[in-house]
Amino acid sequence: HTGIRRQRQMCIRDRCKYIQVDEPLFARKPENALNFGIKNLERCFKDINNQSIEKITHICCGYPDKLDAVDYPKAPLDSYSKISKALDESIIDTVSIEDAHRYNDLNFLKDFKQTKVIFGLVKIASSQVESKEEIVLRINDALKFIDKEQLIVAPDCGLGHLPRDLAKIKLKIMVEASSSF
């Protein structure tokens, strides 16, 4: 915890507006997330009472080790629904979820009453480019369960698997799709 505490203090000192902790196991082991994981995640943000610093967590569902891999392990589809209420009741301001590489039943979004959701709409390990129309449809699907002010569009995760030109194309389409809202 000393390393996390040191990093947290540096972020506060440097006036970071956002502090994000990636969480690789909550979606794979939701029972552990509920039993002790979320409490430990909150400890990462201990003493950040400054309202100008947004506390974010990314809940990873799993990604392949190369572009366009098909059969690789992913977290169970019901994972987000098992932990959404507890995350909303935590001190986390924003939860980042992955939806593009495996569509979720978005009913769990209604559990987020106070927490914002970064909604993954672009596959980060696929060379297939999402259409503007499919992104718009998925945003509309999400807005059936969560207020527009709480929804932030984004790629599923980091863009490290994608060549730079492809990443730019995907992001441009995502921005165009989201600008219609």
Regions found by a protein language model. Give the residues of each.
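Single conserved hydrophobic/aromatic residue that forms the stacking wall/gate
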Residues: H1-I12
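Active-site-proximal loop/short-helix segments
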Residues: R15-G37, H58-L67
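Distinct, well-ordered alpha-helical segments
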Residues: P30-I38, D68-P76, D105-F112
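Flexible glycine/acidic-rich beta-alpha junction loops that bind and position SAM and/or redox cofactors
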Residues: A27, I59-V70, H101-N107, G160-R164
